A protein has these predicted regions:
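Short acidic-hydrophobic, aromatic-tinged amphipathic segments that line or gate anion-handling sites
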Residues: 10-12, 84-90, 123
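Thiol-based oxidoreductase modules, predominantly thioredoxin-like and allied folds used
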Residues: 57-73, 81-89
Length: 144
């Protein structure tokens, strides 16, 4: 297996929204790599997007890699995912080194680059909350 890529130019991410618009991050971002056939992922969605006011420096997205766009669109609708926060990825999953879902990936933006800060497997809701709080604390101290 190739060594994971840790820096990306925006154009190299290969991400797009469900409506096919390309994705260009304006801030640091958090990606939750998920799958349409992942029961743990389903349990996380509502918690992942809750409490955003307290984490306003973060930008959260759910990323589906290697999934058919219509399947992702249908899944997003049935799970009430905000369409502007759902992204489709080509091989970004593999390039970052994500090996299972759900995995949360933290990327810091600087100029025209995103830098991989951390990637963690999320086994459940309590783990998700813990990692989001840690990121919020680091962002508040400008340490993310």
């Amino acid at each position: 297996m190739a060594k994971p890529v840790t820096e990306f130019k925006f154009a190299d991410l290969g991400l797009r929204h469900i409506d096919s618009k390309s994705f260009e991050p304006l801030h640091d971002v958090i990606f939750l790599f998920a799958g349409t056939r992942c029961p743990v992922c389903e349990a996380l969605h509502a918690h992942y997007f809750s409490g955003e006011a307290e984490y306003e420096k973060q930008r959260r997205y759910v990323v589906f890699s290697g999934e058919h766009p219509q399947r992702v669109k249908d899944y997003s609708i049935s799970h009430n995912l905000p369409s502007e926060r759902v992204l489709l990825a080509g091989d970004l999953f593999a390039r970052i080194g994500v090996t299972q879902t759900p995995t949360m990936v933290f990327l810091r933006r600087s100029e025209d680059m995103l830098h991989l800060e951390n990637a963690v497997y999320i086994p459940g809701v309590s783990s998700l909350g813990e990692h989001l709080r840690n990121v919020a604390n680091r962002a508040a101290s400008n340490d993310l």
